[in-house]
Every structure is written in structure tokens, then in C-alpha cells.
């Protein structure tokens, strides 16, 4: 389980996050919903160790304290991040990008076996292993980014706006793949503005407003609660 508590981030006098706390179990999808500027991306980066936080931050994964662990060591501990910009190498091929994601220190299976699992999730990538990522569509590049993160065999996968810029068809394909990843035992924490699609696949959700978590619950409860929809979801895409 990923356990996060007391995460506060400030930029000068601006408090971007205030004592954020959440949990993610392996084998579940948790979505963070909020408007632009709510602090969603800041929260993911803080969890991944990419931003300085106020004293008191706690991040634990499987009982291990990751609060002061460097980002590359966090990956080795079982936490992987797919950033909004995808973080892939556009001038390299699909195969080369996947290879860069491999983490021999977490070798529960061979690299070839793990790549076979990734290509099973995203069959289109198997047909394009020698293709340069720069020549691929946005949806295909997102698949490469997620595939590369999965090559590290994470226990928890963090995804920042994975559906951003994708067509409705590609969003459905992507979220179907995320369900399969969840069912394989990986926990997923998504930052999303696409409320309808993300809540449809999520097990639980958190509502973030002005840097504070102002609500959480089962995804079905959030979908059906009129007050929640009006107060927190009404301005988000897909609602």
C-alpha cells in the first residue's frame, strides 16, 4: 500500500498543497480530480520526490519510508511516475525507450518476459518496436510512456493526465489498458480532468481544491452524489 500524509508545498508565499493525505492499495485505481491549478500535478511530483516539501511529509510504500528517498531510488522501491509530458525520448525507438525503463534491481521476471507483458497490453507497440517515437501519434506515445514505466515492475504507478489530448476512442482504449494493469496487481494513482471516463474505471477518488483534499470516497458514490457533482465536478471535462 502507498500511504501519503502531511504533504505541503509552497512557492514563495503561495501554498500549493496543504497537508494532503491519501492511500492507494495495490490492485486498485484511485483518481484525483480537480480544476486547473488545484494542485494535482504538484501532489504527484511531491509523492515521487521531485519537489521540496515542508517538514513532516510522509510517503510509505509497503511499509518502507520513502519520504527522504531520491527519485531514482523511489523507482527502485516500486513507485513509477508517467509525467504529463510523457517523459519519453522522442529520437529513440519504441524498443529503446522500453529498454531504458527496465530495472534489474526489481527483477521478478526477465526483461524479455516483462516486455512481452507490456506488449500484450499495447499490441500496437509490438508492430512498431523499431519506429522512432517522434513519428508516432500522441496516443501511441502515451502507450510508450506507460509501457516504459511498467518495465520497472512498479507496485504503484502514478499517471499525470494520461488522457490529455487523446481522442475519445483512444481514451477508452487507454483506460481499458489501465484496468488490465490494475487487475495484474499494480496500484494506479491518476490525476485527471476527464471526470466521467476516469471515475468509470476508478475504485476510489479524491477531490482537490486550492491545494486541499476536500472530499473522497468510492468512485460510484462520487458519480452519484449531486452535491459533489455541483461543487467539485461541474466544471470538469466529461461531467
Per-region residue spans from a language model:
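Glycine-rich phosphate-binding loops of nucleotide-dependent enzymes
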Residues: 1-239
Amino acid at each position: 500500500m502507498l500511504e501519503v500524509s502531511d504533504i505541503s508545498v509552497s512557492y514563495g508565499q503561495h501554498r500549493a498543497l496543504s497537508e494532503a493525505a491519501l492511500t492507494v492499495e495495490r490492485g486498485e485505481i484511485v483518481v484525483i480530480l480537480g480544476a486547473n491549478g488545484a494542485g494535482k500535478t504538484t501532489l504527484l511530483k511531491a509523492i515521487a520526490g521531485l519537489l521540496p516539501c515542508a517538514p513532516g511529509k510522509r510517503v510509505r510504500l509497503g511499509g518502507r519510508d520513502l519520504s527522504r528517498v531520491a527519485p531514482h531510488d523511489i523507482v527502485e522501491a516500486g513507485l513509477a511516475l508517467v509525467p504529463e509530458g510523457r517523459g519519453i525520448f522522442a529520437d529513440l525507438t519504441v524498443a529503446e525507450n522500453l529498454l531504458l525503463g527496465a530495472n534489474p534491481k526489481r527483477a521478478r521476471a526477465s526483461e524479455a518476459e516483462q516486455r512481452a507483458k507490456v506488449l500484450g497490453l499495447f499490441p500496437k507497440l509490438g508492430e512498431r518496436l523499431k519506429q522512432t517515437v517522434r513519428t508516432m501519434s500522441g496516443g501511441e506515445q502515451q502507450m510508450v510512456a506507460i509501457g516504459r514505466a511498467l518495465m520497472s515492475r512498479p507496485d504503484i504507478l502514478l499517471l499525470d493526465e494520461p488522457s490529455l489530448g487523446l481522442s475519445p476512442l483512444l481514451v477508452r482504449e487507454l483506460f481499458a489498458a489501465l484496468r488490465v494493469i490494475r487487475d495484474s496487481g499494480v496500484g494506479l494513482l491518476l490525476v485527471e480532468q476527464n471526470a466521467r471516463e476516469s471515475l468509470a474505471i476508478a475504485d476510489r477518488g479524491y477531490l482537490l481544491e486550492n491545494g486541499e483534499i476536500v472530499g473522497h470516497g468510492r468512485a460510484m458514490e462520487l458519480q452519484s452524489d449531486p452535491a459533489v457533482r455541483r461543487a467539485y465536478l461541474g466544471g470538469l471535462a466529461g461531467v
